[in-house]
């Protein structure tokens, strides 16, 4: 295993809301994604989800509050909590998620990704 340069990996793709797998460890996957606009409200019944912002500002709308995640910060959405990521401008994130997680959780939408591309 060699080091992975996150910026070089981000340079390999342009599509939005379509996470790319860059690694796995201990039943977890490490994903990179570029976001812009609004995602769907969804939840992951059995998995927590970590959003780490590398570039930009991410808003995560919950049913009862709004979370703002700035560059260099992360937020963990607890399992079972409905959330909707929003990016007014392009945002680059790293996601740490269990391998069992489904992209749009309990919702099937046009943007749902069944299998993450490895880069």
Question: What are the language-model segments listed below?
Answer:
Residues 63-79:
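Short acidic-glycine-tyrosine-enriched beta hairpin
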Residues 6-41, 47:
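A short glycine-rich, His/Asp/Glu-containing loop-to-beta-strand
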Residues 34-35, 44-61:
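Short, conserved beta-strand element in jelly-roll/cupin
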Residues 60-61, 77, 82-88, 93-95:
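Short beta-strand His + acidic residue motifs that chelate non-heme Fe in jelly-roll/DSBH
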Residues 27-29, 36-38, 55-59, 66, ...:
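Short, charged/polar surface micro-motifs in flexible loops or helix N-caps
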Residues 2-10, 23, 88-119:
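Double-stranded beta-helix
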Residues 26, 54-55, 70-71, 89:
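A cytosolic small-molecule/anion-sensing beta-strand core signal
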């Amino acid at each position: 295993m060699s080091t992975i340069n996150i910026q070089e990996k981000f340079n390999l793709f342009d599509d939005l809301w379509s996470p790319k797998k860059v690694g796995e460890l201990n039943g977890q996957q490490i994903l990179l994604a570029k976001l812009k606009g609004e995602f769907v409200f969804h939840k992951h019944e059995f998995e927590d989800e970590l959003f780490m912002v590398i570039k930009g500002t991410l808003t995560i709308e919950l049913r009862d509050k709004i979370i703002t995640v700035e560059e260099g910060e992360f937020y963990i959405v607890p399992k079972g909590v409905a959330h909707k990521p929003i990016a007014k401008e392009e945002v680059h994130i790293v996601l740490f998620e269990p391998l069992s997680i489904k992209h749009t959780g309990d919702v099937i939408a046009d943007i749902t990704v069944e299998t993450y591309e490895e880069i």
